[in-house]
Regions:
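Carbohydrate transferase catalytic cores enriched for Leloir-type hexosyltransferases
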Residues: 1-181
Length: 181
């Protein structure tokens, strides 16, 4: 089976989500040699890389360039909207190049990658219930895209029963689609 994981958050300073992505991907690679894993950094790679980790030995010129570009965008918030539109168009183009059996989106909002099944992790809904805890640009993006894109998911994983309950109430979807991991 061909499985793709969105690893774009690994190009930035690692947060809780970034660390979760990195460790989950590493564990899958070690525990599951039967499937073929792809990692999406804005390009598809069969290598798990994490430029933000000082111990990462598999960095390359492309990942370093993307890490630098992501840092530039982070330092210039006024560009984020324009860059986000360009990224969205690029993801749609890249999505047409490959198709996967499973797409795992570990960061709330699935991209337009082509896969037979989509699994998305929602860690919490604080962006809805506590927007003051989040950067302004995230609060501008999440409400616009979350509900529409999460609907693409065949399965939604939540970090807790509490978050699962919030998802079921908010999204009004079948209970069998939302699971706690």
């Amino acid at each position: 089976m061909d499985i793709v994981i969105n690893t774009i958050p690994l190009l930035s300073r690692l947060t809780g989500v970034g660390n979760c992505i990195y460790h989950t991907a590493r564990a899958l690679l070690e525990a599951d040699p039967h499937n073929r894993y792809w990692f999406y950094y804005g390009y598809f790679s069969d290598r798990l890389i994490c430029p933000a980790r000082p111990d990462e030995k598999s960095r390359g010129a492309v990942s370093d360039a993307l890490h630098t570009a992501k840092g530039f965008i982070d330092r210039h918030p006024a560009l984020r909207g324009v860059i986000r539109d360009i990224q969205h168009a690029y993801h749609r183009l890249a999505a047409g190049t490959l198709s996967f059996d499973l797409y795992y989106e570990p960061n709330y909002i699935p991209l337009d990658l082509s896969a037979r099944k989509v699994v998305t992790t929602v860690h919490d809904l604080s962006f809805i219930f506590h927007p003051e805890w989040h950067p302004k640009d995230r609060i501008e993006v999440f409400p616009q895209h979350f509900r529409q894109r999460i609907a693409r998911s065949d399965v939604i994983t939540a970090d807790s029963e509490f978050t699962r309950g919030e998802l079921l109430e908010l999204l009004k979807i079948e209970e069998s689609r939302v699971r706690v991991v």
